[in-house]
Amino acid sequence: MGLKSFLKLVEIKTKAASMTPFLLGTVFVLYRYQKFNWVNFLLMLVSLLCFDMATTAINNYLDYKKARKTEGFGYEEHNAIVRDNLSEFSVLTVIVILLILAVGFGILLFLNTSPVVLILGIISFSVGILYTFGPVPISRMPLGEVFSGLFMGFVILFLSVYIHLNEGALVE
């Protein structure tokens, strides 16, 4: 899988939705508290970006697997798996690698901060996966966008402030 296919699979242009609250929280903490923790910033950045890309790839993969009509309505152009003739194995490999990176960097962030990050991380990862996947995905429910807005708008913003202010690292 080439870089262009990967970027289309993870819909890189949509990552602004998760990066905006992350960067806003960081700018706020810089302005209000004059604090910035490079290590925590980078750990959360990588974890957040990898997880966002993984959930988008999962969504595209499930759309590909569940497609009833595979022609028309721009399906051939909009689904990267079809457009670039990506193998299921390569798509699943990308998803697994992104999830491993997201979890790994998330655990490192938790170890560098506090259990609050772990608890919110577990809840956020669960909602992110269940948003697209499961017997009844959250996105198909009437309150799907409320869940999305709460986690993308509040939890990411809160954590992006919290990681810079928390001084009680579990691992020193």
What are these regions (language model features)?
Residues 22-24, 28-61, 118-129, 169-172:
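Membrane-embedded alpha-helical segments that form the functional core of polytopic membrane enzymes
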Residues 25, 29, 33, 59, ...:
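Membrane-water interface at transmembrane helix exits
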Residues 51, 55-99:
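Aspartate-rich (DDxxD/NDxxD/DxxxD) Mg2+/diphosphate-binding motifs
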Residues 17-19, 58, 69, 93-94, ...:
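Generic hydrophobic alpha-helical membrane-span motif
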Residues 1-21, 131-144:
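Cytosolic-side membrane-entry/anchor segment at the start of a transmembrane helix
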Residues 79-168:
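Intramembrane alpha-helical segments
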